[in-house]
């Protein structure tokens, strides 16, 4: 069994929950820990518990609920939901835990935060980075989602177009179309035999998501709508592994845009996987990432 330590970091007017999975006694614990940055914004750390197995390799696994969701829930303060807030939180967590050397793994929005840390903060303390189903440009992401929407049935395309034109994202037809799109490219319904962390009820940060991103994955309208680090990716000088799935919201074009511009980057494209490659092909994901971490400790 793993040793799991939970704690809270005072942050702004709330507090940030974190969870540390430590290697079993008797294993080599000299390896750099890995910090996991969840998506959303507002999706919680829960799904990352399927990656507790990284501790089997002798390294601590650190995850946290970003302010605004999960055990760090906070709402009614829309002015907080900016890249700057979550960047300050990440740096505060690193200081609080006394980390000087670590790996980063960011999924979806978490990878956007990771890119900003690598570039704006000079990748301080980072041994390597895993960019999992993420993006360097919100506008490119939006264009790619709209390209994939064209493969939906005509009536679903129409429902989405009408919602975007009217701003009414509560229409039943739109909601059904959006659910279908997300099932195709993000994640399907959670089955009764899925890992407990995926079945567990979570407190999502709806206000954080809507304010920072928008009403859905393909309409970036919030504070992150102009997020674009594409032209600065060449400033990254730590080893980077890009992971995406063939059926992912992170399309091959989105992933290749990063791969082409980050010096000496590696890219693993997972066949048949959607936005959560670590769920759709858990065994391969863990094998690929653990090998990467060992090579870059």
What does each of the following model-derived ranges do?
Residues 158-238:
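Alpha/beta-hydrolase
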Residues 17-74:
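Conserved HGGG/HGGXW glycine-rich cap/lid loop of the alpha/beta-hydrolase fold
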Residues 127-168:
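Flexible "cap/lid" loop of the alpha/beta hydrolase fold
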Residues 100-144:
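Conserved hydrolase catalytic core segment
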Residues 265-297:
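Catalytic active-site module of serine/aspartate enzymes centered on a nucleophile-bearing elbow/loop
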Residues 223, 230-273:
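Conserved loop-alpha-helix segment in the C-terminal half of the alpha/beta-hydrolase fold
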Residues 63-109, 113:
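Active-site loop/oxyanion-hole signature of alpha/beta-hydrolase fold enzymes
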